[in-house]
Amino acid sequence: MKLLKRTAFSLLGILLLILTIATILEKIYGTDFVNEYIYSSLPFVILWGVTAITSLLYIIKSKLHRQPVIFLLHLSLLFILAGAFTTWIYGEQGTMRVRQGEQQTSFTDSKGISHQLPFSITLNQFEIIYYKGTLAPMDFISHISVADKDCHRQIQGKVSMNHIFSYQHYRFYQSGYSEDNEGSVFSVSHDPYGIGITYAGYTLLLLSTVFFFFSPQSRFRQLLKSPLLHRSLTVILLLFAFSLNSNFLKANSPSPKVLPREVAEHFGDLYILYNNRICPLQTFARDFTIKLYGSSSYKGLTPEEVLTGWLFYYDSWKNEPIIRIKSNEARKLLEIEGNYARLKDYISTINEYKLEKMMNHIRSGEQVTDKRGIEEADEKFNIINLVCTGAMMKIFPCRNIAGKTLEWYSQSDQLPQDMDNDKWVFIRKSMSYVNEMIVMKKYNDACLLLEKIKKYQQKECDGLLPADNKFKAEKIYNQFDYSKSVAMACICIGLICFIYYCHCMASQKRTSRKAIIILNILLWIVFTYLSAAICLRGYVSNHLPLSNGFETMQFMAWCTLLLTFLLQRKFAMLLPFGFLLCGLTLMVSMLGESNPQITQLMPVLQSPLLSIHVVVIMIAYSLLAFIMLNGVTAVILHQSQKECKEQIERLQIISQIILYPAIFLLAIGIFIGAVWANVSWGRYWGWDPKEVWALITMLVYALALHPRSLPWFHRTMFFHVFCITAFITVLITYFGVNFLLGGMHSYANG
């Protein structure tokens, strides 16, 4: 019995170590290397098989079948492994390329081996569906015919993103298309048995999880009945400090020339094609200001004032230290002190571009110190030039002669030769007229000209522009630029709460009811702010805002507050957790990019399964973060000189209670993601670094759910230290993969 137990858990430990090493090797040697020598290798498969068999024998010896729900839960995992093994043996995956009008009867696997199909595929037509009024693709659709000689029949089918065509257990997925739009690339998967077994495992896992939480015999229900929970609970946070370098402008520094605010706002009210999306010009102005300065406001000026300042008062603005330079190497090349450069700092006294020599080295592939920082500084210089010449201001829509397609142009673009003369003159001259009115300070006339441009936009687009409500909603959302301030406020409030609750715990006093009411009011204010920001962003983008790192961290902060509201009645001292964790996640969301642009969603990301997958996993991460902070609190209390044994035990029970839904949500989230991946591109598991680290996280935390087999987890302090250490896997899963290891899930890779 002991030998089986030690063998099973030792093998699991070896698997975790191999998976960890594999993700590092993938970064060094590439995906093909680890797929061939680790993930698809026979020894790796045998190791999983031996681990599964040993675990099954241990489960039987432990007489776990006497607890049907727990037994089914473990059995579901074995089903999933059995499905993966079946896929490894019988499954076939490959790629098929077919031209329009051509017939194809085979596909090629990753090793270049051709596999014959028992039928033929003919591509009748390939089409790209675009988002309204833009050239951003919304979906790729292939219309196909299948000819089956054995059955003497021919059927019609359609393959598109998130829409599979299946025939005789062969599944076809739209994975690409030819450059001339005359051909399609299909991912082909033939897995007649593995998918069914795996999905049976997923279903069994979901059902057994639900039954577990409702079973009176489950350990989760027993923990809820613990007498320690019916006394005053104390849950406290440890705050780790964020060092924020703030740069303040001197109050007496002169402001550059700008338009009157109401005139600048008229500019912000125009439509623009930006980032393959029709949006308010205000959005472009905001992103432009953030790109240059790192904030949407400069010296109290609005983004519209900053943008129009560069457009109409270039000589004044080129002397402004508005360009944020993060790279020390770039600062040396520009010969500046401090973090901000002026545009004229880029040009030497002999009228040479200071970064030109270094950029030539970069373009030629030479090794350069801080290549990324220099490229970023160069990019900002080029963006200003493109804005000041009007090249980025695509504010003039124009239909072609047939009226079928809509193109957007800037004043400086090459216009079609067959364009109507009146349109040509309007596009070429209207902004010049606006400039003349501004030079003569005839601001009312300038506003009238801007209104004419907007009427031209509305007439030319005719039904393709965003709805008025959506347009206004985006302008309102652009005002929600206070995440950093909210984050700092939450951290400060959380710190005060932390000190206050520590004092109450040490002196055995009850927390003030007034303090709790005030904290709840503040929590509601932050929750309302976040809810409004997330809803507006989702409404404007036409999809759940969970498509990048910024959005998922904002959603995690929202989940944290929601969980605080739901749990604080049972665990009243969770209140500091809510503030601190919300503040930290909001601060993290601001680290990579102040606020990424709203973009059209890639076709493959339009599945509702993806949104559910991200939501469930973000909630799980929030719960695991609570547990980690709970553990930190326990360690602080343990190190104090006062007797806090009972409080530490309470913290352990709270963490154990939260741990069950956290792990089950993480497991369900992983497998929902697997179903989405199978629907989207034909494989439910691809050993992507984020998939691997999510699996590692789930398995590591699952160890803490086995105190009978691993008696160390009965020790209170061991449990808390384990939960703190285990949170490293969550950090690697999210940040390590996104910014270091890379992979298909990496937000940093776009």
Model regions: which residues?
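Solvent-exposed, non-transmembrane regions of integral membrane proteins
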Residues: 1-750
